Amino acid sequence: MHFSTSTSTIGVVAAVLLAALILLYRAALPKPIHGIPYKKGSEKRLLGDAPDLLKWRNETQEVFSYMRKLAKDLNSPVFQLFMRPMGKPWVVITDFREAYDICTNRREEFDRSAFTGEVFGPIVPNSHIQFATDDLWRSHRQLLRDTMSPMFVASVIGPIIHKSASGLVSLWRTKARLANGQPFDAEQDLARCLVDLIVSSSFGYDVKSLKAHEDSLSQKVVKGPKDVPMEFTAGEDTEACTSLITLASGVGMAIRSPFPKIVLPLALRFLPSFASAQRYTHNMISEQAGAAWNKFSKAVNVSRDEQVTSAMDLLVLREEQMARKEGRESRLDLPVVRDELLAFLFAGQETTGSTIGWSLKYLAMNQDIQKKLREELRAAHKRAAQTPGASPTSQEIVDTHIPYVEAFIAENHRFAVTISCMIRHTIKDAVVLGHVIPKGSDIFCLTNGPSYQSPSAPVDESVRSKSSQAAKDKFGVWDETNVGEFKPERWLEKQPNGELRFNRFAGPSNPFGVGPRACFGIKWADLIIKTMVTQIVWNFDIQETPEDLSGIEASDGASHRAQKTFVRLVALQ
């Protein structure tokens, strides 16, 4: 009898446990948002869409192209992905107008996603990039405001960009001569160039990455077949360059990880390369801040900006000016200034470098466009064109607006989609395209598919928000017959006098984000890209590379970066 009781007790316990497990399993299954399309069958799997997306990433190195493919399969401007057990679905929006409306006009319903903080927080905890759009965020943006003023960008940042671009031209002239028609990998040279110019612009520190690389470049090369990449031998990069690139790579590491909040802090604590890179970088910034402090705190007259040579200088000067005006001791919150300026590096070095890398690809793939671009540059920069060995100066590049150059850069942005997605978070229940999105949901606004590079999915105008309907005519719509072609002319409008004018509202494209959470450094990025494209096209014929070194395959991390950035260059002067 005792045995029977024990057996029945065990049976009851087992049944209860089984029922609990079944209930727990069902609770962990994805909970679709009513009415929003999704991939059938994924709602019945504990891990939802995650296995399919991870398989795609492992096969292609991309993430957002999977979302683009799913948008096409579902033929819907809005759909949902199930990526986390017991978590809310990700809502993906491919419609440009609705994404623009969410980011610009609906600030009381949407804010930046917590994902941004998880990625950048461990490495720049005091930067506004990870803050919600609140008073603290606004105070940090106010602190940085003058670093984006037209005068500062043109007079201080412009010459630094030009110097670094000229350094890249010098290095590539040497490599083009040694390669003698063979292609070579340009990716690391672009990274060195961007580190040089952003660190110098931000902190006033000359990393000299390109110079050190060129000086150590061996003149002895092993010649190979014309289509085989030339491999150069050079000394190791400087500690400054290595440290900064290593630290910046942490952002991409976090983005690629399923657990960004964990992986980067662990790397900074336990990986010697990351720990030493952070230590070196913080020490360098402290020294530059000290130099700027000494320069301006002891100055008799701080009413003029002639001594400003970097963003660090400018921030220290503004604090000294404010302190003297208010009759108090000046003070500098070094961790805040350090992290805000480091964010320029981490965001700018990766995204801008990727954008320039893509431009090299599209110039090589479209020789007629490259020829037209060079003709327009030489027609506009007459002094440099008529002076043997000369290139446009920094001020000439800043002051000269060439519609075709602007159109090429815009079309390169449209195809490169360096930032393939803008992520927002619902801070209250919100209606998007007729669907109620619950509070606390992440919204992924794609910039790489329908309405941008392919025809839009159909949308009933009546389900759009009122602000979206009101802005219907703000942007054009791309011609569906050629939306997939690389065509800079689509951005140009003929004026009554016959001249062509660049129209940035010609159609959907979103390279820097929009609204209050758009890229803060857009003015720096614009000038970097304009200067680099001008200098490269002016000085080199960018020839086609063999098929196995070409292609538009990409890798998604901190940016949408080309997997292969090989160039075949012929110096023109």
From Swiss-Prot:
Main localization of the protein?
membrane
One GO molecular function term of this record is: iron ion binding
Detail which positions bind heme: 519
* Record EC number: 1.-.-.-
What is the topology of this protein in the membrane according to its UniProt annotation? Single-pass membrane protein
* Cofactor(s), by name: heme
Check the record and name the SUPFAM superfamilies matching this protein. Answer: Cytochrome P450
Q: Which PROSITE patterns match?
A: CYTOCHROME_P450
Is the keyword Heme assigned to this protein? yes
Q: Look up the coiled coil feature and give its residue ranges.
A: none
Q: Briefly describe its induction.
A: The expression of the dibenzodioxocinones biosynthesis cluster is positively regulated by the transcription factor dibT.
Q: Which Pfam families match?
A: p450 (PF00067)
The function of this protein is: Cytochrome P450 monooxygenase; part of the gene cluster that mediates the biosynthesis of dibenzodioxocinones such as pestalotiollide B, a novel class of inhibitors against cholesterol ester transfer protein (CEPT). The biosynthesis initiates from condensation of acetate and malonate units catalyzed by the non-reducing PKS pks8/GME11356. Pks8/GME11356 lacks a thioesterase (TE) domain, which is important to the cyclizing of the third ring of atrochrysone carboxylic acid, and the esterase GME11355 might play the role of TE and catalyzes the cyclization reaction of the C ring.
The family assignment reads: Belongs to the cytochrome P450 family.
Q: What is this protein called?
A: Cytochrome P450 monooxygenase GME11363
Q: Which organism is it from?
A: Pestalotiopsis microspora
